[in-house]
Amino acid sequence: MPRGRARFTSRCDHAGVATDKPQTISYPAPEARPHRYDDVAVDPHVIVLFGATGDLAKRKLLPGMAYLDQSELAPNIQIIGTSLEDLTDDEFRTLAKAAIDAFGTHKLTDGQWDSFAQNLTYVPQGAGPEALAAAVARAEAVLGPDVRRLHYLSVPPKAARAVITMLRDADLVDRSRVVMEKPFGTDYDSAVALNDFVHETFKERQIFRIDHFLGKEAAQNILAFRFANGLFEPIWNRNFIDHIQIDIPETLGLDERANFYESTGAYKDMVVTHLFQVMAFVVMEPPTALEPRAISEEKNKVFRSMLPVKCSDVVRGQFTGYRQLPGVARDSDTETFIALKVGIDNWRWAGVPIYLRTGKRMAEGMRIISIAFKEAPRTMFPPGSGVGAQGPDHLTFDLADASKVSLSFYGKRPGPGMKLDKLSMQFSTQEVESAGDVLEAYERLILDAMRGDHTLFTTAEGIESLWERSADLLRDPPPAKTYAQGTWGPNAIHQLIAPNAWRLPFERAWRDKK
C-alpha cells in the first residue's frame, strides 16, 4: 500500500465498515454552522486526571482547573485524580493545595480552596477499572443529570495505550472526551498505529490532541490580526513576503526530563507538535468560518502542501554537558537544538522559505514569529542614507504571556538631509481593557475541550501528514553539532538562513533600545 493512503482515505463509513472512498468534508449552510460560543456555560463535567501527581498536573492542570471552577467558567466539575501512587483523598488534596499555592497565577482564598477541595477525589490506578468506574459514578451522582466526562491523559506516551484500555474496560467511553499530550507518535508508522488504536475506542470527534502553544492568547491573535483586518491579508503572500521565522529559544535545561528527551529530541518534542502548528496559523488560507471543522481543514491543507523536510536544510545541535546528565548515553547524538528551513508548495507561499528554530539552554527565552517583507528599491536614496542597513521591514508577533505585535519600518531621521532610521509601532494586550481576563494556555484548552471545540487541537490527519514529511530527516539525520550553553546555537545556523539573518537577538535588542 503506498505511503499516505491511510491518511487520505477514510478508514470506516458510518456503519463502521472499512472503505477506500476519498475523505471529504461537507459544510452546512452558513446559518446552520456550529459557530463557536465562547461565553456559553459548559455542561457539568467529571474530569478524570491521569498522571495527577506528575509535574504537568502540579504546575498547570490542577491550578488551571481550580481557576476554571472558582471563576465559574466551569462551575460544575468533579475531579478524580489517578496515578501510580497510592494516595488517599486527603493526601491528594494536600498535594493539590501545595501545587496551586506554588504555581497558580490565580491565588485562592481559604474559602475558595475549601469549596474547590470538595470537588477532589483520588483513585490509585492500580485499583483497576472497576474502582475508577465506581468513583466516576459517585461524582456524576453529585453533579446530577446531563453530565459529561473529560479524561485528561497527563502521562508519558508509552502509557497512553494502557490508559485508553483502562477507560474502555471501565466503560467510560460514552459522553466522554479524551485529551492527549504530545508527542503523538515518533514517526509516521507509530502515529498511524497510535491513532488506529485510539480510534478502536474513541471516535475522532472525542479526541483532543493538545498543543499548549495554540492555547496562548498571542497565537490565537494571529487569526484575528490576519482575518479581521483588511490591512495585511492582501499582502500576506509570496509577492510581498520574503521569508518567515518562527523562533522559540529556551533558557531552561532538561532537569529530570533528560531520560525522556534522550529518546525524543527537539524535533519530535517541539517542532512537530508545536512549531508546525503555529506555522499553520500563520500561513493557512482564510477559513469559511471561525469554527473547528473549517479551521482544522485549512490547517490540514497547509500540512498536505508542505514539502518534505530535507536533511540539507536542517541544523541539529546539542549543548555542552548534555551527555553528562543522568539517563543520557555518553555517545548520544540526540539534539537539544534544531533549526530548519521548510517550504509550502501552494499558490500563496511557493518559494517563500520558513525558518524554524528552538533549543534548550540558549541565550534567551523568547517566542516570536517574524514576517520579513520584501525590500523596496534603494537607488533613489543617496549613499549613506541608511536605507536597508537594518534589514527589511518586519512584522513580529511576540508569543510571550505579555504578548506584543510590532511593525518595524524605515522613516526619516529628524534634521537636515535624508537619513533613515528604523521606526516601530507596537501593540500590547496590556493596553486592552480586558487584559486581566486572559486565560492561561492550559485553562483555555481545558475549557475548549469541555465545550467540544477542536479549533486549537491537532487532528489525526494533520499529525500523520507532518510525520510523513519528516521521514527523510528521521531516517538519516545530520549529526548534532555542539553549542555552548547560553548561546544561540551552532554557528551553522547562519549558513542555513543566509543571505538573511535571524531576527533574534536583534529584535530584542532593537526594541529594548527604544
Where are these regions (language model features)?
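N-terminal amphipathic/basic-hydrophobic helices that include classical n-h-c signal peptides
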Residues: M1-G16
